Amino acid sequence: MALTQAQQDIRDEFIQVHGAWGDAWERILELDAGFLRAYLNWAAVPARRRALEPKVRELVLVAVDAAATHLHAPGIRQHVRSALDLGASAAELTEVLELTGTLGIHACNVGVPLLIEVLAEEGLRSGPAQLTERQQALKAQFIDSRGYWHESWDGMLELDPELFAAYLDFSALPWRSGVLEPKVKEFIYIAFDASATHLYAPGLKLHMRNAVRLGATTAEILEVLELASLVGVHAATVAAPILAEELRVSGGS
């Protein structure tokens, strides 16, 4: 389908802002150019804010798309490619995936405190047990490697020190040998905690605080949130090509 001049202008501006174009955007442009224009204006805000360096912006978008709650493969590929084009190393991108891979522990961060509540309500628990020497050592090791402690870890450390120890080893790896600066690591956590597919408020506040204490600016954190907010457009990028195909099959318009 030949584009109108207005559609071509939107396409050209989109490529200028985002540096990429694809079939999904083409189908959206054909179906509703006004929608794509409105999205472009929205998405251009973080792109033009430039509080984050371009490479870090792409790393944040990789985390949003690669999170277990989203797993948006087309976006992962696009933003991995863009990050590489902007000079990201294999080690940096691998570290983003390692940091993003910790999301699953929130099953325990949310679930263990609820389990403790149920045990107390059922008369099976009178209060927290005193930590053993091993548990105290694990807590100290966590603080040393991660630089913080949060009450959400208390129950897991008490009830399941084996899992806590294994998770500590898993989650501390990028902090021991990673190449991203600490505040950028925190941006990755903020990105997937803030995403509409997760919305994990306790972790979001914790990692915002960590980032601020590591020197992050308000503008940087706002830009991470702005980037995470764009995830909703994947409703259109996934479905618009399907809609266009079904319209062709049915002869609709």
Would you name each region that the model predicts?
Residues 72-91, 200-220:
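Mid-chain, well-packed structural core segment of small domains
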Residues 94-113:
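Hydrophobic, ordered structural segments
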Residues 68-74, 104-108, 196-202, 233-236:
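Short helix-coil transition sites and intra-membrane helix breaks within transmembrane domains
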Residues 54-59, 90-95, 182-187, 219-223:
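Alpha-helical scaffolds flanking conserved acidic
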Residues 1-56, 85, 108-184, 213, ...:
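Acidic, glycine/proline-rich low-complexity segments that act as flexible tails and inter-domain linkers
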